[in-house]
């Protein structure tokens, strides 16, 4: 049997992390079995579905490299097919027309609630032989079995059973002629030959209804697996107040797709004690029976730790391709300065996100207007003039501009003046970067370049002289 899974988002907003994890699990299961992964857009909610949301979902999928083998299919383009199946069910007697008014249904609901009963349709039109005009408004309901129960073996939760008496005669076509969500899903899974439906636990109550419709159509019933929800670190359902929940917001915040994927796969699934997984390892090891039944808590610190790991573990040239976007957001002109791959090597240890990296690298490429006030007050004092003049002259004398030779020049200055490295290094750092913190000074000065470094030291010396004149 060829394994076929699907990811079927409703395009009413962005791709959130819960949806992305469901997509990832479906994708991994298909890849693990050499099967196919289908993308289906469930856009039957015409009022809330937007083209922007469809684009945002695909952007998120593409950024995570969760490529689909079939689709995207759109439910709104399949209405003829759904209606043909409904007409067939009406003929076969597995569905019926219901003419009950909203007022009657509301009164029925209130009566049932008052008795403490679960509100459900009472089947009046199911057994009615009244004649109605062809143009009289009606809905179409599925004639749900009235006896027995529906049992399915959830691949994550084990056997789940629903009594048919608890299930309603579901509306499958509205008065305006449009088919309903639960019905469209069934026909899609049948037509697309989906073998495994992996989705959120909020769909568990839909499953028995969908199974009954599939059986009425004499269609194969797929295997179901319902993934638990994701909570924030406070135990409440993950939402915007916990920070980013959209996949592309994580991109904007400077996360690598590898870090988010690795984090999401471990959010409810495990393979021994392993924390770091390549894409190939995820595919190789992923099984549904290792997915947890209990809710997962989203931990941003853990994601940040993973991101820092991947910034340093992945090839710098690759990380640089993702960094480029963030550099553009900061409007930094990188034509004069180190290659971005070299920048990744320079700043990788210090920066946990690419956004942080882009925001802290400007001095490598552009001259700064002024020194950081606190750093200048502390380190650009008259006592720093001599160390800066001596180190400037030694840097000027370098013919082979390497980080090693820069280091020798700084060391030689400290030796000559008989002071600690900090007495040379700190003023030099503020002079060339404008700030009190940077990567190792030798590689920083080397990356900034000889001409620019010497110009900046002269600027710092002028700053010191100006301060002296003011006192």
Swiss-Prot record:
It catalyses: tRNA(Glu) + L-glutamate + ATP = L-glutamyl-tRNA(Glu) + AMP + diphosphate. HAMAP family: Glu_tRNA_synth_type1. GO terms for cellular component: cytosol. GO terms for biological process: glutamyl-tRNA aminoacylation. This is Glutamate--tRNA ligase. It comes from Escherichia coli O1:K1 / APEC. It comes from the Bacteria. It is found in: Cytoplasm. InterPro entries: aa-tRNA-synth_I_cd-bd, aa-tRNA-synth_I_codon-bd_sub2, aa-tRNA-synth_I_CS, aa_tRNA-synth_I_cd-bd_sf, Glu-tRNA-ligase_bac/mito, Glu/Gln-tRNA-synth, Glu/Gln-tRNA-synth_Ib_cat-dom, GluQ/Sye. A motif ('KMSKS' region) lies at residues 237-241. The lineage of its organism: Bacteria, Pseudomonadati, Pseudomonadota, Gammaproteobacteria, Enterobacterales. Belongs to the class-I aminoacyl-tRNA synthetase family. Glutamate--tRNA ligase type 1 subfamily. PANTHER family: GLUTAMATE--TRNA LIGASE, GLUTAMATE--TRNA LIGASE, MITOCHONDRIAL-RELATED. Monomer. Its EC number is 6.1.1.17.
